[in-house]
Protein backbone atom coordinates (compact mmCIF):
# COMPACT_ATOMS: atom_id res chain seq x y z
CA UNK A 1 0.00 0.00 0.00
CA UNK A 2 1.64 3.21 -1.22
CA UNK A 3 0.14 6.42 0.10
CA UNK A 4 0.80 10.13 -0.35
CA UNK A 5 -0.50 12.53 2.31
CA UNK A 6 -1.78 15.91 1.14
CA UNK A 7 -3.06 18.91 3.07
CA UNK A 8 -2.11 22.36 4.30
CA UNK A 9 0.56 22.85 6.97
CA UNK A 10 -1.10 22.13 10.31
CA UNK A 11 -3.80 19.89 8.78
CA UNK A 12 -2.46 16.88 10.68
CA UNK A 13 -0.67 15.02 7.87
CA UNK A 14 2.24 13.93 10.05
CA UNK A 15 0.00 12.73 12.88
CA UNK A 16 -2.17 10.66 10.55
CA UNK A 17 0.83 9.34 8.58
CA UNK A 18 2.34 7.95 11.79
CA UNK A 19 -0.94 6.28 12.75
CA UNK A 20 -1.30 4.71 9.29
CA UNK A 21 2.31 3.50 9.39
CA UNK A 22 1.77 1.86 12.78
CA UNK A 23 -1.49 0.15 11.77
CA UNK A 24 -0.28 -1.24 8.46
CA UNK A 25 3.35 -1.79 9.53
CA UNK A 26 4.76 0.29 6.70
CA UNK A 27 7.29 3.13 7.08
CA UNK A 28 6.30 6.77 7.50
CA UNK A 29 8.61 8.62 5.14
CA UNK A 30 9.03 12.37 5.56
CA UNK A 31 11.32 14.35 3.32
CA UNK A 32 12.81 16.08 6.37
CA UNK A 33 13.88 12.72 7.79
CA UNK A 34 15.32 11.68 4.41
CA UNK A 35 17.40 14.85 4.17
CA UNK A 36 18.71 14.49 7.71
CA UNK A 37 19.59 10.81 7.22
CA UNK A 38 21.46 11.42 3.96
CA UNK A 39 23.40 14.36 5.40
CA UNK A 40 24.19 12.50 8.64
CA UNK A 41 25.41 9.43 6.72
CA UNK A 42 27.35 11.64 4.31
CA UNK A 43 25.86 9.99 1.24
CA UNK A 44 26.60 11.37 -2.21
CA UNK A 45 23.07 12.78 -2.40
CA UNK A 46 23.36 14.16 1.13
CA UNK A 47 26.57 15.97 0.24
CA UNK A 48 24.94 17.49 -2.85
CA UNK A 49 21.90 18.62 -0.85
CA UNK A 50 24.06 20.10 1.91
CA UNK A 51 25.91 22.28 -0.61
CA UNK A 52 22.64 23.99 -1.51
CA UNK A 53 21.32 24.13 2.05
CA UNK A 54 24.54 25.69 3.36
CA UNK A 55 24.05 28.50 0.86
CA UNK A 56 20.44 28.97 1.90
CA UNK A 57 19.24 27.66 -1.47
CA UNK A 58 16.42 25.24 -2.23
CA UNK A 59 17.60 21.72 -3.01
CA UNK A 60 16.85 20.97 -6.70
CA UNK A 61 13.89 18.67 -7.33
CA UNK A 62 16.01 16.00 -9.00
CA UNK A 63 18.17 15.56 -5.88
CA UNK A 64 15.11 15.36 -3.62
CA UNK A 65 13.45 12.87 -5.99
CA UNK A 66 16.60 10.72 -6.10
CA UNK A 67 16.63 10.63 -2.29
CA UNK A 68 12.94 9.66 -2.19
CA UNK A 69 13.36 6.90 -4.79
CA UNK A 70 16.46 5.63 -2.97
CA UNK A 71 14.39 5.43 0.23
CA UNK A 72 11.62 3.54 -1.59
CA UNK A 73 14.19 0.94 -2.70
CA UNK A 74 14.98 -0.06 0.89
CA UNK A 75 13.69 -3.38 2.23
CA UNK A 76 11.17 -1.91 4.68
CA UNK A 77 9.25 -0.32 1.78
CA UNK A 78 8.52 -3.57 -0.04
CA UNK A 79 4.96 -3.64 1.35
CA UNK A 80 4.39 0.08 0.87
CA UNK A 81 4.92 3.39 2.65
CA UNK A 82 3.27 6.64 3.72
CA UNK A 83 4.93 9.63 2.05
CA UNK A 84 4.60 12.96 3.88
CA UNK A 85 6.01 16.29 2.63
CA UNK A 86 6.61 15.34 -1.01
CA UNK A 87 5.61 16.15 -3.67
CA UNK A 88 4.86 19.82 -3.02
CA UNK A 89 4.47 21.02 -6.62
CA UNK A 90 3.04 19.72 -9.90
CA UNK A 91 6.52 19.29 -11.50
CA UNK A 92 7.60 17.22 -8.46
CA UNK A 93 4.44 15.10 -8.70
CA UNK A 94 4.94 14.50 -12.42
CA UNK A 95 8.59 13.56 -11.90
CA UNK A 96 7.68 11.19 -9.05
CA UNK A 97 4.96 9.54 -11.12
CA UNK A 98 7.36 9.08 -14.06
CA UNK A 99 10.06 7.59 -11.80
CA UNK A 100 7.58 5.17 -10.20
CA UNK A 101 6.20 4.05 -13.59
CA UNK A 102 9.76 3.35 -14.76
CA UNK A 103 10.13 1.04 -11.74
CA UNK A 104 6.79 -0.64 -12.48
CA UNK A 105 5.29 0.96 -9.37
CA UNK A 106 2.41 3.32 -8.66
CA UNK A 107 0.79 5.23 -5.81
CA UNK A 108 -2.40 3.61 -4.49
CA UNK A 109 -3.94 6.65 -2.82
CA UNK A 110 -3.37 10.37 -2.34
CA UNK A 111 -5.22 11.33 0.85
CA UNK A 112 -6.07 15.00 1.26
CA UNK A 113 -6.90 16.20 4.77
CA UNK A 114 -9.21 19.20 4.38
CA UNK A 115 -9.07 21.93 7.04
CA UNK A 116 -10.19 25.59 6.58
CA UNK A 117 -7.47 28.24 6.80
CA UNK A 118 -8.94 29.91 9.90
CA UNK A 119 -8.81 26.63 11.83
CA UNK A 120 -5.22 26.01 10.67
CA UNK A 121 -4.18 29.42 12.02
CA UNK A 122 -5.97 28.73 15.32
CA UNK A 123 -4.36 25.31 15.67
CA UNK A 124 -0.82 26.37 14.84
CA UNK A 125 -0.75 29.67 16.71
CA UNK A 126 -1.83 27.80 19.86
CA UNK A 127 1.25 25.57 19.81
CA UNK A 128 3.90 26.06 22.47
CA UNK A 129 7.37 24.51 22.77
CA UNK A 130 9.62 24.15 25.83
CA UNK A 131 12.91 26.00 25.43
CA UNK A 132 14.64 23.45 27.68
CA UNK A 133 13.47 19.96 26.70
CA UNK A 134 11.66 20.62 23.41
CA UNK A 135 8.33 19.29 24.71
CA UNK A 136 5.29 20.50 22.76
CA UNK A 137 1.88 21.60 24.01
CA UNK A 138 -1.22 23.42 22.79
CA UNK A 139 -3.04 26.09 24.77
CA UNK A 140 -6.43 24.54 23.88
CA UNK A 141 -5.86 20.85 23.12
CA UNK A 142 -2.97 19.92 25.43
CA UNK A 143 -2.51 22.76 27.95
CA UNK A 144 0.09 22.60 30.70
CA UNK A 145 -0.90 22.46 34.36
CA UNK A 146 0.71 25.86 34.89
CA UNK A 147 0.40 28.40 32.10
CA UNK A 148 3.66 28.99 30.23
CA UNK A 149 5.56 26.28 32.14
CA UNK A 150 6.52 22.83 30.82
CA UNK A 151 4.92 19.94 32.74
CA UNK A 152 7.93 17.69 32.11
CA UNK A 153 10.87 19.85 33.16
CA UNK A 154 9.53 23.20 34.40
CA UNK A 155 11.10 25.05 31.49
CA UNK A 156 9.64 28.15 29.85
CA UNK A 157 7.25 27.70 26.93
CA UNK A 158 7.58 29.79 23.80
CA UNK A 159 5.92 30.19 20.39
CA UNK A 160 8.17 28.95 17.59
CA UNK A 161 8.62 31.36 14.68
CA UNK A 162 6.92 28.83 12.37
CA UNK A 163 3.78 28.94 14.54
CA UNK A 164 3.35 32.72 14.71
CA UNK A 165 0.11 33.80 12.96
CA UNK A 166 1.89 35.95 10.37
CA UNK A 167 4.24 33.07 9.48
CA UNK A 168 1.34 30.61 9.29
CA UNK A 169 -0.48 32.97 6.91
CA UNK A 170 2.59 33.10 4.63
CA UNK A 171 2.94 29.30 4.67
CA UNK A 172 -0.74 28.91 3.78
CA UNK A 173 -0.30 31.34 0.89
CA UNK A 174 2.60 29.26 -0.46
CA UNK A 175 0.52 26.11 0.01
CA UNK A 176 -2.45 27.49 -1.95
CA UNK A 177 -0.22 28.70 -4.79
CA UNK A 178 2.12 25.70 -5.10
CA UNK A 179 0.74 22.61 -3.39
CA UNK A 180 -3.05 22.81 -3.56
CA UNK A 181 -2.98 22.20 -7.36
CA UNK A 182 -1.81 18.66 -6.49
CA UNK A 183 -5.38 17.91 -5.39
CA UNK A 184 -6.60 18.32 -8.97
CA UNK A 185 -3.57 16.44 -10.29
CA UNK A 186 -4.20 13.34 -8.18
CA UNK A 187 -7.95 13.60 -8.77
CA UNK A 188 -7.19 13.44 -12.48
CA UNK A 189 -5.22 10.23 -11.91
CA UNK A 190 -8.15 8.74 -10.00
CA UNK A 191 -6.08 8.45 -6.81
CA UNK A 192 -7.51 11.24 -4.64
CA UNK A 193 -9.49 10.59 -1.47
CA UNK A 194 -10.55 13.50 0.76
CA UNK A 195 -11.22 13.44 4.49
CA UNK A 196 -12.62 16.07 6.86
CA UNK A 197 -9.69 17.21 8.99
CA UNK A 198 -11.82 19.36 11.29
CA UNK A 199 -12.82 16.27 13.28
CA UNK A 200 -10.92 14.85 16.26
CA UNK A 201 -7.68 13.10 15.23
CA UNK A 202 -9.07 9.64 16.05
CA UNK A 203 -12.18 10.25 13.93
CA UNK A 204 -10.03 11.44 11.03
CA UNK A 205 -7.93 8.28 11.37
CA UNK A 206 -11.04 6.08 11.34
CA UNK A 207 -12.22 7.80 8.15
CA UNK A 208 -8.82 7.16 6.55
CA UNK A 209 -8.88 3.50 7.61
CA UNK A 210 -12.29 3.19 5.97
CA UNK A 211 -10.72 4.37 2.71
CA UNK A 212 -7.58 2.25 2.99
CA UNK A 213 -9.59 -0.85 3.86
CA UNK A 214 -10.64 -0.98 0.22
CA UNK A 215 -6.99 -1.49 -0.76
CA UNK A 216 -6.00 -3.70 2.17
CA UNK A 217 -8.74 -6.27 1.54
From Swiss-Prot:
Question: In the UniProt record, does the keyword Transferase occur?
Answer: yes
HAMAP family from the UniProt entry: Adenylate_kinase_Adk (MF_00235)
Ranges where the record places region LID? 126-163
Per the entry, what this protein does is: Catalyzes the reversible transfer of the terminal phosphate group between ATP and AMP. Plays an important role in cellular energy homeostasis and in adenine nucleotide metabolism.
Q: What is the lineage of its organism?
A: Bacteria, Bacillati, Bacillota, Clostridia, Lachnospirales
What InterPro entries does the entry give? Answer: Adenyl_kin_sub (IPR006259), Adenylat/UMP-CMP_kin (IPR000850), Adenylat_kinase_CS (IPR033690), Adenylate_kinase_lid-dom (IPR007862), P-loop_NTPase (IPR027417)
Protein name (Swiss-Prot/TrEMBL) = Adenylate kinase
**Which superkingdom does the taxonomy of this entry point to?**
Bacteria
Amino acid sequence: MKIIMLGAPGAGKGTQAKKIAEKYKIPHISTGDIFRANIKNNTELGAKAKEYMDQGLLVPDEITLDMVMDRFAQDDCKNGYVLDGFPRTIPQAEALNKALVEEGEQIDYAINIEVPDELIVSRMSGRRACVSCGGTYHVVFTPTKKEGICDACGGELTIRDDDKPETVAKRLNVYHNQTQPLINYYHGLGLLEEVDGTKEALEVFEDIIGILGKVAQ
